[in-house]
């Protein structure tokens, strides 16, 4: 059988692509080296932020607004346990923060619902938060967080119900191109398709070593909290920049545990074996202490944590482009630790590619040619 589309990597983007392409009537094969959702990539750990006024640049705003529409649609499949939680997101940092300047600019350009607070205003609204006098907060009322593993599980189930073929726990070892399409080699044999999507995440260079993607080991952890830090008490998800420039992110507490991670830093790795479990690197358990001590002093001890990986591009912007010399193969990689919120729209973009549809978005900033 020759498929219309083969998807290599069925984590966040691949799971979405599998669903949207199958729903569009294509004959699709989803593949993954493991059984998604799993612990081997970048999508585990229960939750991911979704921010609309984007500190990484306004080129992302049209994408994230469409992503939000798709997340809302997906959440309707799980109304008892919604995939998207509109907790709001407070972005904290010095008044001269470049990141916050981008957030404010994005909000202004796209007329987003963002409220600016000074230090006293922040602490009055959320007494659990402490910030210096020179800090401001930009509160995104309509943003919140996503249940990442539930989202992937839901997409995979919906794709299967729609007739998608799924080959999991079966690594792809080779991609070949000819005039007739794309062939992949797996332990289960060869499979052919007219087109392919490569969204293999951290270890995409095992298949395409020429790509400018660097795996980085990252950690996040859950700390002892109480009901003051919960969604029920209107405690928001957050990003926070310390005076030294370190960037943190976190979520409202659930079951008396508040999850937090540090966005910058981490350990450059070159193989899956180097992504050692949480606590095997000395700094893992204390990485969030500077933020907690200064901004959330009421949070208690570290309860547990996890390690994941970022697939970083050189400029930490996404790579969304066809493989050089092979227009039938789309790459979606280099998501650099801020990609999950876009998984829905990136999956839709992949499905449009498979149908020979022109994308509704300007993807020029994400082309591979910018690194030449």
UniProtKB/Swiss-Prot annotation:
Belongs to the MSOX/MTOX family. MTOX subfamily. Transmembrane segments: none annotated. Its cofactor is FAD. InterPro entries: FAD-dep_OxRdtase (IPR006076), FAD/NAD-bd_sf (IPR036188), Me_Trp_Oxase_MTOX (IPR023493), MTOX (IPR045170). The gene is solA. The modification S-8alpha-FAD cysteine is found at residue 308. Catalyzes the oxidative demethylation of N-methyl-L-tryptophan. Monomer. One of its GO terms (molecular function) is N-methyl-L-amino-acid oxidase activity. This is N-methyl-L-tryptophan oxidase.
